[in-house]
């Protein structure tokens, strides 16, 4: 039977949270993460870290959680009846960054591991995760850098992995009621176990470690770009799409709220400010129109 080292996964996730928080603090320079350790009554807990009102980041949340129980939630066993009667553990790091400057994109990343065990039987396990970018005033070179980072980290795992997980990301982060993508995508994968534990874990580590490589150069390039009220208003309007996606479609948010997760940590992904405007239309030829015309449908980078 293949050895599944869940302790190594947890150690990696805790280290990843530390590394990402340190990188973001070093970039912001004026604000630090506040840590909130919490326990889940049914088993497990986590540590949530939030940086607020920094010079670069309006809000950044980086959450680690490790929850477990003797019985799977009904919402999970409905889709996977083979999990009934098994104890489970779910652990992961999830983060969302909302910058001050509208020229810096919002970003999101997540890596997670799930295992369900029963004495005398092989464990059922899988990895999932990815990262995606949501620009308001997009630059082609930023989007290409983001996707080139993804291509590079995928290459050792197979020639078609980037394309598969890029397409999956485009499909997942899509708002049907708006007929637009949430942003310019990146990578998304779930239920990954067919490679065996070692390779699946190595890929998940590559995705987690690749996030900062993809994101910080964009932040550094755009953080001093001058902007005014018009850009700020548009940023807040587009943040509304983030709220719509997370509350209506995001599986992690819905699962967390339905399974008695910690609400403050689950909703940490929400922007501190957002706005809606009735029947908004960008002006023809404007930078805002460029986003709608060229960046909110899947494309090759």
Curated annotation (Swiss-Prot):
Active-site feature positions: 108
Residue positions binding a divalent metal cation: 98, 108, 147, 177
Single Gene Ontology BP annotation: protoporphyrinogen IX biosynthetic process
EC number(s) on file: 1.3.3.3
GO molecular function: coproporphyrinogen oxidase activity; metal ion binding; protein homodimerization activity
Binding partners and assembly: Homodimer.
Protein name per UniProt: Oxygen-dependent coproporphyrinogen-III oxidase
Originating species: Photobacterium profundum (strain SS9)
Chain's gene name: hemF
